[in-house]
Design a protein with these regions (language model features):
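Ligand-binding loop in jelly-roll beta-barrel domains
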Residues: 155-185, 273-297
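N-terminal secretory signal peptides and thylakoid transit peptides that target proteins
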Residues: 1-14
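C-terminal segment of N-terminal export signals and the immediately downstream linker at the start
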Residues: 22-59
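N-terminal signal-anchor module of multipass membrane proteins
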Residues: 47-51, 58-90
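Short acidic-glycine-tyrosine-enriched beta hairpin
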Residues: 139-154, 260-277
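Glycine- and acidic-residue-biased ligand/ion/polar-headgroup-sensing regions
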Residues: 120-136, 147-150, 238-259
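A short glycine-rich, His/Asp/Glu-containing loop-to-beta-strand
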Residues: 73-118, 122-123, 174, 181, ...
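Histidine-centered metal-chelating micro-motifs
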Residues: 113-115, 132-135, 151-152, 156-164, ...
Length: 297
């Protein structure tokens, strides 16, 4: 996709316009945004992308995205780091990792937020890291998500929602993740779960899966997410759930070694064509594992 086409798709769908918590009115900031991110044709390989940068290294079955190679968008009220192309950050070689389309590391200023905006046919996951966000949507949900929670929306046939930092004196930090679904035009739904953070101490805590009866929230995709908080020297083996899936590791804090590759804070590592990975914390570390299909159904 050419940049002009990418931007042309970009007037509504990401919700990157400011709204204050006092008036709750959208304030235009003339930012180009995506209107829609369409799923590739049936059974078309999605594969991986990497940015052509000296600090992004691609090897036989891995791709390393260093933290300082991410897109950097500072709008004043919102400071966002984009692992993959998003809004004004466009790199044709860094569009997705399999069905993982968006990984944004966001900071929202006190009293500000994302005004009401639409989505369709996307699985949208939010993981708060610090502070509280108030969520409102067209399904009638009004709730607050905070550190320790995980939120999921299946946009399906279409939803509108907003997210606001109701705190007047501190920012909110959270991860915003989009995953292409394996079913289109499903009935929209909302899910939220408070996790026991002690369940990830020196072990992998499953927080998302394809199965509504499994641990964590669920989505319309054969994907599994795990969070972990490892002390220095802790090691584990992650075994893939599905053959043909890839694993994207986003390191939130500290230093990790994954199959001999070191990643630092806010680095991302994608790996595929393998059955298991060895993960070792070189320092105290917190990280997110995202196992996702590398091809679309």
């Amino acid at each position: 996709m050419e940049r002009k086409d990418f931007i042309r798709k970009g007037l509504l769908g990401t919700g990157i316009f400011a709204a204050s918590t006092t008036g709750l009115q959208a304030l235009s900031n003339n930012i180009d945004e995506l209107k829609r991110l369409e799923l590739l044709t049936d059974k078309e390989p999605i594969g991986y992308n990497h940015i052509p940068h000296t600090k992004s290294t691609i090897m036989e079955n891995t791709v390393l995205h260093k933290a300082d190679t991410r897109g950097d968008a500072n709008h004043g009220w919102l400071h966002s780091k984009h692992t993959f192309s998003f809004a004004n950050y466009y790199n044709p070689d860094r569009m997705h990792f399999g069905v993982l389309r968006v990984l944004n590391d966001d900071i929202v200023a006190a009293g500000m937020g994302f005004g009401t905006h639409p989505h369709d046919n996307m699985e949208i996951i939010s993981i708060p890291l610090e502070g509280d966000l108030e969520h409102r949507d067209s399904m009638g949900n009004v709730t607050v998500i905070k550190n320790g929670d995980i939120q999921v929306m299946s946009a399906g046939t279409g939803i509108h929602h907003s997210e606001y930092n109701k705190n007047k004196d501190k920012p909110v930090k959270f991860l915003q993740i989009w995953v292409f679904p394996n079913k289109k035009n499903v009935t929209p739904r909302y899910g939220q779960l408070t996790l026991n953070v002690q369940d990830r101490k020196n072990k992998l805590q499953q927080v998302l899966s394809p199965n509504m009866d499994d641990e964590g929230v669920w989505i319309h995709q054969d994907a599994w997410f795990h969070l972990a908080d490892f002390d220095k020297g802790t090691s584990t083996v992650y075994r893939f759930k599905n053959k043909g899936n890839g694993l994207y590791v986003f390191n939130l804090k500290g230093d990790l070694t994954i199959n001999g590759i070191t990643i630092n804070s806010r680095d991302g590592l994608g790996i595929w064509d393998i059955e298991e990975v060895q993960i070792t914390a070189e320092t105290g570390s917190e990280f997110l594992l995202m196992e996702v299909p590398m091809t679309a159904k």
